[in-house]
Amino acid sequence: MANLEVTLAGLNFRNPVMLASGILDSTPGILKRMAETGAGALITKSISLQGRPGYPGPTTVEIAPGTWINAMGLPNPGLEEFLEEFPLTSLKVPVIPNLVADTAKEFE
């Protein structure tokens, strides 16, 4: 089998295939399964300091026949609850947080 290991920004990945933020990173069980079935890294859903409810539905709109866009409003439980709910240290692959903030100061 080919060796697909890569190093990026000082992180070692068993392969360059990463699970992007989206539907498949919405529960701890799914993240664990993705790590076990070959993802080189996992990128979390959006995480903010304080929880966000997201936009009320509908969150999709058809902009042309057969062409849809969505905007969820970055719903998330907030950093503390996320860390309690998602046992990231038990995963055997790098986890890249998708951090969002209302101001640059929140990133400090």
Feature annotation, model-predicted:
Residues 3-13, 18, 23, 28-108:
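Active-site entrance/lid segments in N-terminal catalytic domains of soluble metabolic enzymes
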